[in-house]
Regions:
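Glycine-rich portal/gate segments that line the openings of hydrophobic small-molecule binding cavities
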Residues: 38-80, 133-140
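Short amphipathic alpha-helical signal-transduction/dimerization elements
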Residues: 119, 123-139
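Hydrophobic ligand-binding cavity/cleft-lining segments
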Residues: 1-43
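A short, structured loop/turn motif at beta-sheet edges
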Residues: 14, 39-40, 64-70, 88-98
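Intrinsic-disorder/low-complexity, polar/charged segments enriched in Ser/Thr/Lys/Arg/Asp/Glu/Gln
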Residues: 1-7, 43, 58-60, 71, ...
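Solvent-exposed residues in well-ordered beta-strands and their adjoining turns
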Residues: 9-13, 49-51, 66, 90-92, ...
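Hydrophobic pocket/interface hotspot
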Residues: 17-21, 27, 44-46, 63, ...
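Beta-strand/loop substructures that line and gate deep hydrophobic ligand-binding cavities in soluble
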Residues: 75-125
Length: 140
């Protein structure tokens, strides 16, 4: 499993940040590999952008979000990929909100030996992109 971690601070109340991070549409909009978010009868689905969808043969990820206290855990599973993330939020002494993030990518099935090195090479860049986008969207 490929894994990356990051932290960032935004000048917004903790409740607003937690609501943003608990929303699959908002989080999907901050991930470079997500083309759009669809609501289905089963739940929420992220459509995976090309070329990632073609390379991984994973056109979409079925996503589940869970908010528990001051943290959010989400998991997206598709044909050959499982991607999950966690966010833990805390108020700083200055009244801003700090977010600790993790992103994990687990290749599945017959393509796992091929996708494993690709995931390891890209997971940090994917999380960096998320942090930039989330900070921009949460800016006052």
């Amino acid at each position: 499993m490929a894994r990356a971690e990051a932290r960032f601070v935004v000048d917004r109340p903790k409740g607003e940040v937690l609501a943003f991070l608990g929303d699959p549409v908002q989080v999907g909009g901050c991930l470079a590999f997500v083309a759009n978010t669809e609501k289905t009868a089963e739940g929420v689905r992220w459509k995976v952008k090309a070329p990632m969808s073609a390379i991984t043969q994973t056109p979409h990820l079925d996503v589940v979000f869970r908010v528990e206290g001051d943290s959010v855990h989400w998991q997206g599973r598709g044909r050959h990929l499982e991607i999950q993330g966690t966010f833990a939020v805390a108020e700083t002494l200055a009244g801003a909100t700090e977010v600790a993030c993790t992103l994990e990518v687990l290749p599945l099935g017959a393509l796992a030996p091929v996708l494993g090195p690709l995931a390891a090479a890209q997971v940090s860049g994917q999380l960096d992109y998320f942090v930039r986008e989330a900070r921009a969207r949460l800016a006052p």
